[in-house]
């Protein structure tokens, strides 16, 4: 819980930082939506972390992609969008509806959709015609493979409560990582290769 509160405080501080040329990407609204989505995921916790230890799994979150300096500005926006889209797809399923409190789940899906809508508008402003060539880029494929592993895991575990709890914790990691990328974009004004 302390980690989540620290993360929330960091998000609040970032939301007041300079947006530079990426004001569209990193608006206060987008950061507030990200913070609310993390808070909702935290509230969705129904099981003790110790009760599901046998189901824990390393899904291979591509952290080097969001923490390293491998991505250009347009790639970073595509990775952020894909992370949010895949997260939305994961929670907007019949299996997910059976596993979670529907009120919290609906709020989470609405929040993710709001972030997607905002990023989609921003991506259109920056990307223009590059969008089609970036659709097949390695970072996007990596994100898709990461989420495919999560889907396979849920199927393998029969969509059990512990499997969903493991995925909920992983989604908190994934959305935190995407927020880290947003913060890096804010600090560097969009140039991920600057110090």
Swiss-Prot record:
UniProt keyword annotation of Mitochondrion present: no
GO CC annotation terms, alphabetical: extracellular space
Major location (coarse): secreted
Signal peptide range in chain numbering: 1-23
UniProt GO MF annotations: cytokine activity; cytokine receptor binding; hormone activity
Miscellaneous comment as given in the Swiss-Prot or TrEMBL entry: IFN-tau genes are intronless. They evolved from IFN-omega genes in the ruminantia suborder and have continued to duplicate independently in different lineages of the ruminantia. They code for proteins very similar in sequence but with different biological potency and pattern of expression.
Gene name as annotated: IFNT
Function: Paracrine hormone primarily responsible for maternal recognition of pregnancy. Interacts with endometrial receptors, probably type I interferon receptors, and blocks estrogen receptor expression, preventing the estrogen-induced increase in oxytocin receptor expression in the endometrium. This results in the suppression of the pulsatile endometrial release of the luteolytic hormone prostaglandin F2-alpha, hindering the regression of the corpus luteum (luteolysis) and therefore a return to ovarian cyclicity.
Protein's name according to its UniProt entry: Interferon tau
Keyword Nucleus recorded: no
Subcellular location: Secreted
Keywords from the UniProt entry: Antiviral defense, Cytokine, Disulfide bond, Hormone, Pregnancy, Secreted, Signal
GO terms of biological process kind: defense response to virus; female pregnancy
